[in-house]
Amino acid sequence: MKKILSIVMTVLLVLSVAVMPASAEADKTLKFGEDGKFRILQFADIQDNAFLEYATYQFIKDSVAELKPDLIVLTGDNISGGGSPTKTLAKFGIARFMSIFEKAGVPVAMVFGNHDSEGLANKEDQMAMYQNYDCFVGCEGEDLTGCGNYNLPIYDSKGEKMLYNLWMIDSLTYNRHPE
């Protein structure tokens, strides 16, 4: 009986490992399609408050459906920090458009603009909110001024050779030079 139980447990262990991806990063590899194309859809200055305007929501949703991008890049002022003054409202505002991308299964990268952190949710708080989405391929970054400095390699259709390397750089909130 012990031998049978041991065999069953071994088979279950092998099967459970076999269906797991090699790593979380393997699922997020950006690569060209078999057609040799890689389409990036950029949204800038969405900048609505926590209650995303219906027209904006529909425009984003329709654009993703029609253009079928391989990557979506949000290039700042993704929320209106002043219009989403609390962390809860910032999270709700981010969820309104990220839910579209998550449902479509399209990878998303982002950088911050000067209005994103005007409320109580700072950039680090917001980065953590974005990282809760499976479709998000960005990160906080290390050893550089700002939050969200990272690169995204884009590989050929086989995922073997890096063809492009996109850099996401935090331009900081406002340009402040010491006197």
Features from the language model and the residues they span:
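Active-site-proximal flexible loops/turns
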Residues: 9, 49-52, 84, 120, ...
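Active-site micro-motifs of SAM-dependent methyltransferase domains
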Residues: 15, 48, 80, 116-117
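Sec-dependent N-terminal signal peptides of Gram-positive bacterial secreted proteins and lipoproteins
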Residues: 4-22
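N-terminal active-site segment of His-dependent metallophosphoesterases
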Residues: 24-91, 96
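Residue-level signal for beta-strand positions within conserved beta-sheet cores that form or flank
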Residues: 20, 36, 162
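Extended active-site neighborhood of metal-dependent phosphoesterases/phosphodiesterases
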Residues: 26, 93-179
